[in-house]
Amino acid sequence: MRIDVLSLFPDMFSGPMHDSIVGKAIENGHLTMPVTNFRDYSTNKHGNVDDYPFGGGAGMLLQPQPIFDALKATEEQAAAEGLPKGRVILLDPAGVTFNQHVAEDFAHEEHLTFLCGHYEGYDERIRTLVTDEVSLGDFVLTGGELASMVMIDATVRLLPGVLGNAESAPGDSFSSGLLEYPQYTRPADFRGMTVPDVLISGNHGKIEKWRQKEALRRTYQRRPDLIDHDQLTAEQKRLLADVRIEEEERASRN
């Protein structure tokens, strides 16, 4: 996969995006991630990329010209590598909310471009370049850089061969539609807090059933809105019924 980033602050990506999983993906050839400063494409002699909005108002808007030209250049570079133009993602608080399903969708692409804004916003004509407008949530950041890093990390870890254990990503919270079940490592007894017996029983069938039940329990407790009953198997529905009874009994004791 190739991920292009258009940003006024490319140095922000030099650390986080070259460490851990994303860094290993680059090192192992699963990912290339050029970061382009679109100020370099400004035709203004002062290198300006923003201006006041027509009609007045607070703040400055990013001008279309530097971004149009920077995107054209990166798309030509991608084409030289045999890659399609790909999807152009505008980081915008008014966009659709990013989640695991969006990350999975992005992970199927060969080429993505993240457009990181700054200042008050964008000239509306920039949106003609865009295929997706995406937000991290109902809050405003100074720029799109931090949001794009989160989305890139969530996407890259889903690429085939990136994670050391191929089963890691499907087991993550939200990948199955449920939160992840509790996990434990050694020692089995730490300051009186013990690992559930089933996990050290060696009975893989019972372990899997326990994990399904505890994933349902955690989701029921913390994010019941995620539970789609139509998507649950008959076994999961039985386990969820047990969880509800147990949680009601626990609540009545408190």
From Swiss-Prot:
Q: Which UniProt keywords apply?
A: Cytoplasm, Methyltransferase, S-adenosyl-L-methionine, Transferase, tRNA processing
Write down a Pfam family by its short name: tRNA_m1G_MT
Instruction: Please verify whether the record's keywords include Methyltransferase.
Output: yes
Q: Which GO terms describe its cellular component?
A: cytosol
Q: Which residues bind S-adenosyl-L-methionine?
A: 117, 136-141
Q: Does the keyword Cytoplasm apply?
A: yes
Q: Tell me a Gene Ontology molecular-function term this record carries.
A: tRNA (guanine(37)-N1)-methyltransferase activity
Indicate what this protein is called per its UniProt record.
tRNA (guanine-N(1)-)-methyltransferase
What is the name of the gene encoding this protein? trmD
